[in-house]
UniProtKB/Swiss-Prot annotation:
Its main location: membrane. The chain crosses the membrane at residues 13-35, 229-248. This is Uncharacterized protein AF_1654. Keywords: Cell membrane, Membrane, Transmembrane, Transmembrane helix.
Length: 329
């Protein structure tokens, strides 16, 4: 530690300059590391939604104890005798509403299929319509007549392995601009019709289809942790070295005073390792050791105790009939 003090004190100016330069550089690196980077990423965002609805009902055409003749009813199932005609409406638009042209082609088909594989299919009714922004297509279907067409075709075919059915097919083509962006899409919708021997029913439709568009978003990305830890550590070390250099420069204005302090501490440490005694006047062989560290190590390795003669200023020990000594430096 004392040698460290001496080095820092002797090289006060270089240590201070290097510490300050390192401090500024590491502080800048730390500041730069705390600023997140930005990058562009491609994402998809909602552009608009296509909305399609179908619902309807039937007018009662016959006196009965349930509904008044001429009333309009909406039921899960309908009777051929009471409600032979079904009135339905298909509605289409977009959200948000766009500056678009909408074209619809609608047809009512009846068919026969085996294991979901079509055998034959016939068109009962077809219509087309054009509008802007939104569109409504109305249907008025004589389901009693439709049932007769199905039975007639099936009887003509003469095979009854599969099943018969009917549906409404609607193709919607729209083009133009929505929220200022060009669109051109064609969508298809199928509305099943359940035609049974004693009743029929229509499915409803309430469908939303979302459309997305690509967008660029700028996101923040944090820099790796080591890019913050290393500059922070360098900042800390630089501050410590700069502070120590100033403290040692202030405390030890004269380098010689620090050197004397180091020598004093070193001397006190040496004295703690030895015992005091007079070096004997003897005819033993004598070996002089140059450094205290060497004689201290030799005494330790030979398991001998090291002594110090204050009057002569000599460290010594005896081993194997030989007196080893080291003069005080």
């Amino acid at each position: 530690m004392n040698n460290f003090k001496l080095i820092v004190r002797k090289w006060y100016i270089p240590v201070l300059i290097i510490s300050l330069i390192t401090l500024v550089a590491s502080a800048y690196a730390l500041y730069w590391a705390t600023i997140p980077e930005t990058k562009e990423t491609q994402i998809s965002i909602r552009h608009y939604s296509a909305l399609a609805y179908f619902s309807g009902g039937a007018e009662v055409k016959k006196d009965n104890p349930i509904w008044a003749n001429g009333s309009f009813v909406t039921l899960p199932v309908y009777s051929y005798s009471l409600t032979p005609e079904y009135s339905g409406e298909f509605y289409f638009t977009t959200a948000p509403r766009g500056d678009i042209t909408i074209e619809t082609e609608a047809k009512i088909v009846y068919f026969y299929e085996v294991s979901d594989a079509p055998v034959w299919e016939k068109v009962y009714y077809a219509a087309s319509n054009t509008s802007r922004g939104e569109i409504k297509t109305n249907f008025k279907i004589n389901v009693t007549d439709l049932k007769s067409k199905i039975n007639e075709a099936q009887n003509s075919f003469g095979v009854y392995l599969g099943k018969t059915g009917a549906r409404i097919d609607v193709s919607v083509h729209y083009y133009g601009k929505i929220t200022g962006k060009d669109v051109d899409e064609t969508l298809s919708f199928k509305i099943p019709i359940d035609v049974q021997s004693t009743y029929y029913s229509f499915s409803t439709l309430n469908e939303t289809r979302d459309f997305e568009m690509p967008s660029t978003r700028v996101v923040e990305v944090q820099k790796p942790l080591h890019m913050k830890v290393i500059p922070a550590a360098l900042c800390t070390v630089s501050i410590i070295f700069a502070g120590l250099s100033v403290v040692y420069r202030t405390k030890y204005s004269d380098v010689s005073s620090l050197e004397r302090e180091i020598e004093r501490v070193s001397w006190e440490k040496k004295l703690k390792e030895v015992s005091f005694a007079r070096m004997p006047e003897t005819n033993l062989e004598m070996v002089e050791v140059e450094r205290f560290e060497d004689i201290s190590k030799a005494a330790e390795e030979t398991f001998e105790h090291l002594f110090y003669d204050r009057e002569k200023g000599v460290f010594f020990f005896i081993h194997g009939g030989v007196l080893y000594y080291c003069r005080e430096k």
